[in-house]
Amino acid sequence: MNDTQHTPPFIAVVPARLASTRLPNKPLADIGGKPMVVRVAERAVESGAQQVLIATDAQAVFDVARAHGIDAMMTRADHPSGTDRLAEVAAHYGWRDDMIVVNVQGDEPLIDPALVRGVASHLAATDGCAIATAAHPIHDPADVFNPNVVKVVPDARGVALYFSRAPIPWARDAYQPHWPNIAQMPAPPAPAAVYRHIGLYAYRAKFLRTYPSLSISPIEQAEALEQLRAMWHGERIAVLVTNDAPLPGVDTPDDLARVQAFFGSSA
């Protein structure tokens, strides 16, 4: 992990909602004797954030956070995304324009605190960017062609050129449009490294306050990728490249069982 030597002050916000179709009440799922959302917040604390808080529209999540000594804020229930929820929090607290706010997903109890700290540092070190995120190289050809694996192409400065569910960049001489078997595809050629986007974001508070006023963009709708809204409106996104893939989050009961085993708990 390439981390800036002097990490700037930053705030970590954990958006959490109970309305999960695949895993109801996910933030409250027990992981080693603590609710998942608390485990996530503890990772955020380990990152060195000067403030960690849980943003939720559920009273049960708010109460659990406070019971474990974690700051929490009740937000509106009609937010279409976690970024919109963060925008409400930023407006409520009135953080200064250049304060860095990291969105730590509430279903990532195994998130590496160094990665949280890293995206905050990367944003502070990259002039002209309102957002920072992370990515790692893809080595499995199946992931290159998997639309559920979001790819990102950064420029020479490490600023995102585009995010897509499609295989980008397309290595013209290495790939054929109709492979009979994905398993037979070659790994991405070195000159055209393919990066998998990691869904961790750091924002400047000024951007968060303007985000709700940005109109939904055609490319955001086509790709179903929220970050493309910011790019459509001219914002630049810095990309921190790390060699290691993060441990997966919790989306399904099987994911939960795996994480519970990691923490030595029982389902």
From Swiss-Prot:
Q: Which GO terms describe its biological process?
A: CMP-keto-3-deoxy-D-manno-octulosonic acid biosynthetic process; lipopolysaccharide biosynthetic process
Cleaved signal peptide residues: none
Chain ranges passing through the membrane: none
Q: Name one GO cellular component term.
A: cytosol
Q: Which domain of life is it from?
A: Bacteria
Top EC class per UniProt? transferase
Q: Extract the Gene3D superfamilies matched here.
A: Spore Coat Polysaccharide Biosynthesis Protein SpsA, Chain A (3.90.550.10)
This protein's pathway reads: Nucleotide-sugar biosynthesis; CMP-3-deoxy-D-manno-octulosonate biosynthesis; CMP-3-deoxy-D-manno-octulosonate from 3-deoxy-D-manno-octulosonate and CTP: step 1/1; Bacterial outer membrane biogenesis; lipopolysaccharide biosynthesis
Reaction equation(s) it catalyzes: 3-deoxy-alpha-D-manno-oct-2-ulosonate + CTP = CMP-3-deoxy-beta-D-manno-octulosonate + diphosphate
What keywords does the record list, in alphabetical order?
A: Cytoplasm, Lipopolysaccharide biosynthesis, Nucleotidyltransferase, Transferase
Q: Name one GO molecular function term.
A: 3-deoxy-manno-octulosonate cytidylyltransferase activity
Where in or outside the cell it occurs: the entry states: Cytoplasm
Q: What EC number(s) is this enzyme filed under?
A: 2.7.7.38
Q: Which family does it belong to?
A: Belongs to the KdsB family.
Functional note: Activates KDO (a required 8-carbon sugar) for incorporation into bacterial lipopolysaccharide in Gram-negative bacteria.
PANTHER family named in the record? 3-DEOXY-MANNO-OCTULOSONATE CYTIDYLYLTRANSFERASE, 3-DEOXY-MANNO-OCTULOSONATE CYTIDYLYLTRANSFERASE, MITOCHONDRIAL
Q: What is the protein name stated in its UniProt record?
A: 3-deoxy-manno-octulosonate cytidylyltransferase
